[in-house]
Amino acid sequence: MQLNSNEISELIRERIVNFNLESEARNEGTIVSVSDGIITIHGLADVMQGEMLELPNNRFALALNLERHSVGAVVMGPYADLSEGMKVKGTGRILEVPVGNGLLGRVVNTLGQPIDGKGAVSFDRMDPVEVIAPGVIDRKSVDQPIQTGYKAVDSMVPIGRGQRELIIGDRQTGKTAMAIDAIINQKELGVKCIYVAIGQKASTIANVVRKLEEHGALENTIVVVASASEAAALQYLAPYAGCTMGEYFRDRGEDALIVYDDLSKQAVAYRQISLLLKRPPGREAFPGDVFYLHSRLLERAARVNEEYVERFTNGEVKGKTGSLTALPIIETQAGDVSAFVPTNVISITDGQIFLQTQLFNSGLRPAVDPGISVSRVGGAAQTKVIKKLSGGIRTALAQYRELAAFAQFSSDLDEATRRQLDHGEKVTELMKQKQYAPMTVAEQALAIFAAEKGYLTDVALNQISRFEEELMAFGRTNAQPLLDKINQSGDYNDEIESELHSLLKEFTALQS
């Protein structure tokens, strides 16, 4: 088929008329190298630190190195099919995650996408993962307790709402168990919880989720997962994503608790990314800003004042303070708390609960070492009844440890020393507690009262656990109004003291 000159000119005229003159400005670059999840991009202009870069097949990378002629970015997800020459687009957005009440009861990944097979997540809004922590003027002092349900913690190292309390110890010393029990204990107290699992085995995380579900605490909890098999970038970002989800509740005048399990693995993931980006290594091969990595995260846990909440909610919530309490976990190697990351996090947080392998293996669980465990601000927040009753607990345990070491070299001890050793031994036994069995304030007060007022003197050491169980059952059956009164008010006065004495006298009379 041949076209004549008229037809050709008509086709050209039609093309000219229909030519699309619209232009689109796109910030686009080209991948010049891919290795170990790190891509180097040439040609991208106006990229922000931490910006989301769009890759083929609906994937994203995070811009971390902004150099004169190229951008170094870390891929969030699989990268095996990426190759040189592929196009990368700038989005102009910092990473955001979904937040809101709809996330409670769900298991999500670092990006807030559901991984529990329960369908799409309902959320209120998208918030950036990196935000500046509230300033000094916006904060309120910590003076309300957060109950972990552990006698050893609530009596000796109390935690307040808005505090950062580090849980530190070797592997297999009960760090995760303590954090999970603290979450389970919040289900009746109206505190929303976020559990961030970083670099853990998927089977371990599945077990934690199952336990939370069994104890009715999952519906009050958001579980954020960046398992060991996921990209280092997702493990590095997971704590920030979880913190943003927790800040949603804090900024609306509610109380939230977040557990980072654990920040050692986040630091290792960040070290991996930094070394691949060719940043200069420092002590233990960590980059120079590893302190800032954790400080900017943990400073976001705070108790904010009424004015901050009112300003944030545009006047919708008035006269309420909000709080985000953080329980970061750090794993030590052979009990070395002087390593780089542990010392960093100890200096950032408001105290630490040190779990010791030796105590754990000797059967003392939770294996809290009262010698170096401390709460720097929690004392002001401690429930009055526990504060007044537990004053002698730490002293008794410290003196017992000292005397026990001394008694090994001496057989003839005077009566006062024997009594002190006996009391310390029984208090140590009383501090033991089963997993997934958090205690109310009243139950803790009753147990500590029995120890402090000498009701354990005639109880054999191997009978302490049975004595405590039977005492709790007796109290729930015969003195529930008293326990309710202590739980509601948290006060301790002469009337409550005499009622506790009456209860224990009645109970010990039945035992004899």
Swiss-Prot record:
Q: Does the keyword Kinase apply?
A: no
InterPro entries per the UniProt record, alphabetical: ATP_synth_asu-like_sf, ATP_synth_asu_C, ATP_synth_asu_C_sf, ATP_synth_F1_a_nt-bd_dom, ATP_synth_F1_asu, ATPase_a/bsu_AS, ATPase_F1/V1/A1_a/bsu_N, ATPase_F1/V1/A1_a/bsu_N_sf
Instruction: Tell me which GO cellular component terms the UniProt record holds.
Output: plasma membrane; proton-transporting ATP synthase complex
Catalyses which reaction(s): ATP + H2O + 4 H(+)(in) = ADP + phosphate + 5 H(+)(out)
For binding ATP, which residues are annotated in this chain's numbering? G169, D170, R171, Q172, T173, G174, K175, T176
Subcellular location, record wording? Cell inner membrane
How does it sit in the bilayer?
A: Peripheral membrane protein
Q: Kindly state the subunit structure of this protein.
A: F-type ATPases have 2 components, CF(1) - the catalytic core - and CF(0) - the membrane proton channel. CF(1) has five subunits: alpha(3), beta(3), gamma(1), delta(1), epsilon(1). CF(0) has three main subunits: a(1), b(2) and c(9-12). The alpha and beta chains form an alternating ring which encloses part of the gamma chain. CF(1) is attached to CF(0) by a central stalk formed by the gamma and epsilon chains, while a peripheral stalk is formed by the delta and b chains.
Principal subcellular localisation of the protein? membrane
Q: Which GO terms describe its molecular function?
A: ADP binding; ATP binding; proton-transporting ATP synthase activity, rotational mechanism
Which family is annotated? Belongs to the ATPase alpha/beta chains family.
Entry function = Produces ATP from ADP in the presence of a proton gradient across the membrane. The alpha chain is a regulatory subunit.
* Site positions (Required for activity): S373
What keywords tag this UniProt record?
ATP synthesis, ATP-binding, Cell inner membrane, Cell membrane, CF(1), Hydrogen ion transport, Ion transport, Membrane, Nucleotide-binding, Translocase, Transport
Keyword check for Kinase, yes or no. Answer: no
Q: Which domain of life is it from?
A: Bacteria
Enzyme Commission number: 7.1.2.2
Question: What is the enzyme's main class?
Answer: translocase
**Identification of the protein by name:** ATP synthase subunit alpha 2
- Pfam annotation, one family: ATP-synt_ab_N
